[in-house]
Amino acid sequence: MTRIKRGYIARRRRTKIRLFASSFQGARSRLTRTITQQKIRALVSAHQDRGRQKRDFRRLWITRINAVIRANKVYYSYSTLIHHLYKRQLLLNRKILAQIAILNRNCLYMISNEILK
């Protein structure tokens, strides 16, 4: 069998992987096999965390809305506010409601008063 000389192509591939893993600790940034394994794990974790991030932000928005509502007794709970919003067909998403709750509470009170009428 003849020898295949492909020197710089494999080196380029390995250096690209090494640049990705340059911030990893120990052998995970030095040994090629462990670098490739860690790269796969890192990308899998990044994919999972993008889904988790969406859930976490939704939980944060709900918590913020609920805190403002309960603090000033506009409604008894978050769920009743959302229920009445849907009943009145005021389709404001939770992200916008959380921004209103933090930055301009009076506006949230005006919205809740409109629902009560």
Curated annotation (Swiss-Prot):
InterPro entries referenced in this protein's UniProt entry, alphabetically: Ribosomal_bL20, RIBOSOMAL_L20_CS, Ribosomal_protein_bL20_C
GO biological process, one term: ribosomal large subunit assembly
Species assigned in the record: Morus indica
General function of this protein: Binds directly to 23S ribosomal RNA and is necessary for the in vitro assembly process of the 50S ribosomal subunit. It is not involved in the protein synthesizing functions of that subunit.
Name the record gives this protein: Large ribosomal subunit protein bL20c
Family note: Belongs to the bacterial ribosomal protein bL20 family.
Entry keywords, A to Z: Chloroplast, Plastid, Ribonucleoprotein, Ribosomal protein, RNA-binding, rRNA-binding
The keyword Oxidoreductase is annotated on this UniProt entry: no
HAMAP family: Ribosomal_bL20 (MF_00382)
Pfam families with a match to the protein in the record: Ribosomal_L20
GO CC terms, sorted: chloroplast; ribonucleoprotein complex; ribosome
CDD domains cross-referenced by the UniProt entry: Ribosomal_L20 (cd07026)
GO terms, molecular function: rRNA binding; structural constituent of ribosome
Gene3D superfamilies documented for this protein: 6.10.160.10, Ribosomal protein L20 (1.10.1900.20)
